[in-house]
Amino acid sequence: HTGYAWLGEVGYNHKQFSGLATFRVLKHMNTMLTLEGQGTGNVLNYLPALTRQYTYMLANLNPYQVNVNGEIGGQADVYYSIRPNGQRSKYWNFHANFSTYYSDKNLIGKSRLLWRDINGDIEHQWNKKIKTGFLVSVQEWSPTHGTTERTYASNIFVYDMTYKFDRKTSVRGELQYLYSEDYEKDWMAALIEVNLAPRWSFSISDMYNNGDTKKHYYNGSVSYTFDRTRIQVNYGRNRAGYICSGGVCRYTPAYTGAGITLTTSF
């Protein structure tokens, strides 16, 4: 197949306000290492998903995957910040994001919704010790990647709070809830993270499906950073599904076990 891609961006910035809009068209832009190979290990080039990349568990439960056969869409971001004069330890940050993608036209000339996400978040630094954040995301996606018109919808709510004891010690907590009438129904999640800068970090988390399977997906991790190297050890129960990092997605089966991650920069 002959492939092509169009990408357009426009941005605006004035004082505390900024905005960015991106539009993209893709058609057969993936390059495979072998003709008969399958999976992400057989893909030579990188096609990022131009959507908001979440770090929260439930907001990233069903991430968008680029439709390499053909998609059209884009996203828009708007930022606004309120920072009182002379008070660096107090501020408000407001952010709104919208992204949507449709499949290429089929044989009857009709395209279908692949992904839509309408989200917004507010971050508030109360003083030198306390920072809070609240996020709302309304996501709709195609479970068949545009093969049929059926879509699933999720409404996600996240509360995030960080407390700093001093310059090196802080604790952060998350409370999350996902409401849905589709697929696995409702989810809830919580996380506690302790940071002892600049070396140690500890965290425990749990996702619970209270709408269908009634299963817990717990995880605990310890990480140590030295110079430009970071090593992390974790143990937990992981659900089957796609794991995405930087827009690259791979399918992972359900498992319970431990893992070691080593990251270094040169």
Feature names for model-found ranges:
Residues H1-F266:
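Exposed, low-structure sequence patches enriched in small/polar residues
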